[in-house]
Amino acid sequence: KNSEHFFHNETTDSDAEVIGFYIGAKDVEDTGYKYCGPVTKEDLQRERSGFNDGILVHIDDIEPEKMDEGDGWSITDFRLPISKKNGSSTTVFNAKFMPGAIHKKHMHTNCEEIYYIVSGKGIAGAGGEKTYIKAGHFHYIPKSVEHWLYNTSETEPIHAVGLYIGSGSVEETGYVYLGDVTGEDLII
């Protein structure tokens, strides 16, 4: 908040994808966003020693969490780059669901969840609704709403990045396992 910042893609031959979230803002105006001008050559050449405020981590430096498959977790690689472990009251997760994986029915009684599908395809359910999902989909799940995810691919994992808003850990989300995803659930 109140910190001038920018992102610059240094490559000339590939696109960069930036996924960001403004937590607690109802719209862009509510974030306090202010355009400060284009990124200049001087901005790019300025010496940097790191962030004075905030957290910057690389996903490869984060150990995968050990989630209990008996509680509906069939995620092969689940990492929490931002959480109460590094001082945040909201958790950011990075998850990979391998081909055929199902994140079984569950809910979070203490938080809302938002996730973005970076790659892969499958079926997602929330409340009484279900839909096909693929890269580019965002999914918002209010607190205490049953939801699940199924990777329908035989070859490609689903890669999702998301937030547990206002919960600094999975435990703080109020995670409740609700049971298996059935064949009936998968019919759209």
Where are these regions (language model features)?
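Hydrophobic, ordered structural segments
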Residues: 1, 6, 16-40
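Short beta-strand His + acidic residue motifs that chelate non-heme Fe in jelly-roll/DSBH
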Residues: 4-12, 104-106, 124-125, 141, ...
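A short, N-terminal "cap"/entry segment at the start of jelly-roll beta-barrel domains
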Residues: 29-90, 174-188
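Conserved short histidine dyad/triad with adjacent acidic residue
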Residues: 74-80, 93-108, 143
